[in-house]
């Protein structure tokens, strides 16, 4: 109840504007990749900090670019001696920044600020830890789940997915929801949607007992081409090659926007999803155009449920000019007030366990409870562990295209890709 009260109170505080700037203020720079909606919400988050720190203003510097470009911009500014005071760190950038030694270890500062790391979700916190060092305080995260259209389930008389469903259940439902709804002989509603990009099928691979890399992250052979991985890849690409339960673009390189638009228009019943799509879904649910539910990623019978989490955190450059203030700002942005205000935007789950639980208690849709349950089975992505992951991830769609477009056997395609990734990873050792 106390957490729920904090959440409501935080929203009220977040609605207030910051005090008017005065001469002689110290300006701190917060670097992130926020779009205009996120930047507006972050200004609400920053207002209480500026109010409680007279003489301090915080200026957001939003990149408005992709993650790779953002990383290079930040690293360049650090190398040039003009780092931001605080930066938003994506999980995929943790290895590059920690390997270069450009981030401040926050652990020695946290006791003085009263920051108890036990309050954070331990899996999410581990994304930003290296031994005893803490290089960022978790801001928020999402596990990957399934988003589904309740109306399509109801029209077909299919019960909503339960927490412990299997691949067999998913396939049976997807077939039942792939339909010719107007009787013209053409399928115009599909059970699900396929995507060749790894971040959207990682959870499917793991929930089938497979993986891309072996322990340590420096070899793919023996893991990507293992029997479990091959079977998971065969099953996932089989949505296209065997089951015909997905809309098929002529080259299968449809964008995320294409699949989302098909979902919003009632043409796709189930979609692999993260919390980051909730802000896009809300307008459709609030005006009654969609009734949406979420469910955990189903697992292969005999394999344990698993999913992947994607997270971001607040870091301080080792060369930050205002080190004390920078650490205070990072700690504030990752603490309960900021996370509660930010939760209203729906982009992510709060990384503080109590804040996430409070959000779930207040959520009348039941969505947040599903994300919380999914996080119990979540793993840290490889991108948070090895620096060359961007190159690995960029190569993986080629394997999927070999299978779905060129009709290469998944075992052959996986073996080819494993050898290719071995060579790529060897260059970085």
Regions found by a protein language model. Name each.
Residues 173-175, 218-252, 297:
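Glycine-centered hinge/linker elements that transmit conformational signals in sensory
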Residues 295, 344-395, 402:
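Long, aromatic- and glycine/proline-rich binding clefts that accommodate carbohydrate-like moieties
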Residues 57, 156, 238-246, 277, ...:
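Extracytoplasmic/periplasmic substrate-recognition and gating elements
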Residues 48-120, 155-157, 261-262, 269-270, ...:
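Extracytoplasmic "Venus flytrap"/periplasmic binding protein-like
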Residues 35, 107-120, 163, 182-191, ...:
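Short, solvent-exposed loop/beta-turn-alpha elements that line the ligand-binding surface or hinge
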Residues 76-77, 83-85, 113-152, 189-191, ...:
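A structural signal for short loop-to-beta-strand junctions that line the ligand-binding cleft
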Residues 89-143, 204, 291-295, 360-364, ...:
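Hinge/lid segment of periplasmic solute-binding proteins
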Residues 131-139, 144, 169-222, 268:
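Extracytoplasmic/periplasmic solute-binding protein
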């Amino acid at each position: 109840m106390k957490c729920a009260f904090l959440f409501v109170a935080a929203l009220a505080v977040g609605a207030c504007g910051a005090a008017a700037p005065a001469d002689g203020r110290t300006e701190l720079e917060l670097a992130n990749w926020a779009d205009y909606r996120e930047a507006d919400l972050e200004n609400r988050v920053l207002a209480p900090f500026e109010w409680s720190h007279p003489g301090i203003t915080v200026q957001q510097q939003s990149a408005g670019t992709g993650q790779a470009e953002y990383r290079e911009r930040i690293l360049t500014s650090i190398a040039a001696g003009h780092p931001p005071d605080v930066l938003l760190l994506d999980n995929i950038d943790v290895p590059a920044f920690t390997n270069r030694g450009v981030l401040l270890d926050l652990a020695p500062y946290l006791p003085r600020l009263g920051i108890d790391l036990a309050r954070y979700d331990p899996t999410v916190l581990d994304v930003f830890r290296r031994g005893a060092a803490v290089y960022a305080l978790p801001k928020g995260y999402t596990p990957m789940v399934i988003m589904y259209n309740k109306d399509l389930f109801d029209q077909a008389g299919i019960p909503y997915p339960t927490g412990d469903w299997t691949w067999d259940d998913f396939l049976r439902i997807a077939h039942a929801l792939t339909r010719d709804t107007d009787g013209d002989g053409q399928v115009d509603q599909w059970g699900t949607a396929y995507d060749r990009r790894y971040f959207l099928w990682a959870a499917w691979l793991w929930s089938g007992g497979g993986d891309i890399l072996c322990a340590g992250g420096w070899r793919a052979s023996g893991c990507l081409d293992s029997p479990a991985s091959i079977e998971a890849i065969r099953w996932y690409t089989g949505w296209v090659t065997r089951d015909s339960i997905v809309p098929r673009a002529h080259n299968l390189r449809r964008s995320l926007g294409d699949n989302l638009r098909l979902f919003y228009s009632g043409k796709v019943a189930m979609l692999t999803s993260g919390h980051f799509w909730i802000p896009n879904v809300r307008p459709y649910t609030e005006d009654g155009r969609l009734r949406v539910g979420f469910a955990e990623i189903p697992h292969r019978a005999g394999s344990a449920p698993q999913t992947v989490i994607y997270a971001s955190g607040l870091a301080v450059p080792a060369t930050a000019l205002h080190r004390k203030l920078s650490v205070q700002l990072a700690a504030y942005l990752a603490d309960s007030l900021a996370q509660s205000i930010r939760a209203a935007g729906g982009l992510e789950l709060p990384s503080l366990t109590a804040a996430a639980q409070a959000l779930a208690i207040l959520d009348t849709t039941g969505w947040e409870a599903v994300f919380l349950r999914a996080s119990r089975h979540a793993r840290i992505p490889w991108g948070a562990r090895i620096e060359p992951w961007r190159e690995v991830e960029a190569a993986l769609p080629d394997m999927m295209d070999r299978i779905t477009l060129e009709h290469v056997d998944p075992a052959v395609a996986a073996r080819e890709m494993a050898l290719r990734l071995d060579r790529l990873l060897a260059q970085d050792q």
